[in-house]
Amino acid sequence: KYQKLYHYNSLLVRHKFSQKKVRIAGGGIAGLSAAMFLQSNNISTVIYEKESKIGGSRHGDYEGLENWIFNDDIHSSFKDIGFEFNKIQSSPINSFFVHTSSEKPLRIQNKTPFFYLVSRGDNSNDIDHQLFRQCKKAGVEFKFGEMAPSYCDIIATGTRKASAYIQGINFNTNLKNQVHLLLGKKFAPKGYA
């Protein structure tokens, strides 16, 4: 069913945009993904990004790409868009610790990664920059430091206001890298950490 839908969408997109260069407002992950999908279907694209470079508004913060949100594994899902996931620097997370105020930490494990940890930003090891490089190699055109024209075909400029604010901390330790999920009012009122 998924393959039929994907094939239908590819045909629909190819028919609609075959005669022009598709204009995309926003060079975040959504804009890059839209451009790569179209470009891999032989549809020319141009991305308008108001920042001077891709990932410029992020600063090396970490994000988890959940493996369970895709119909197939994350590698296949990225391939369907046109990206090569094996060229993206990431750390598969197969286990993590869950903390509550009433129990000892519980270790959760799985053979298949729960998610892949990636850094965000404009450095060479950040996912934003790595997706940008793959888009450039595929022929996506970029216009930096200018607002998108009002007649863009795809709007991928993100939200106007953050839906959550996250505070992080970096510190040196002799321990191996690890992931901890903190639940409950004591650790994270109205959310999780």
PLM region spans:
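Predominantly flavin-linked oxidoreductase catalytic cores and closely associated redox partners
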Residues: G27, N125-A193
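N-terminal FAD cofactor-binding segment of flavoenzymes
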Residues: G55-S102
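Hydrophobic anchor at the start of a short beta-strand
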Residues: V22, I43-T45, D153, V179
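N-terminal Rossmann-fold NAD(P) dinucleotide-binding loop
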Residues: G31-L32
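Short beta-strand to alpha-helix junction loop
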Residues: I69-D72, N110-R133
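Short, well-ordered alpha-helices that flank and scaffold nucleotide-derived cofactor binding pockets
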Residues: M36, S40, R133
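Glycine-rich FAD pyrophosphate-binding loop
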Residues: A25, Q39-D61
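Extreme N-terminal leader/targeting segments of oxidoreductases
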Residues: K1-V22, S40-N41, A148
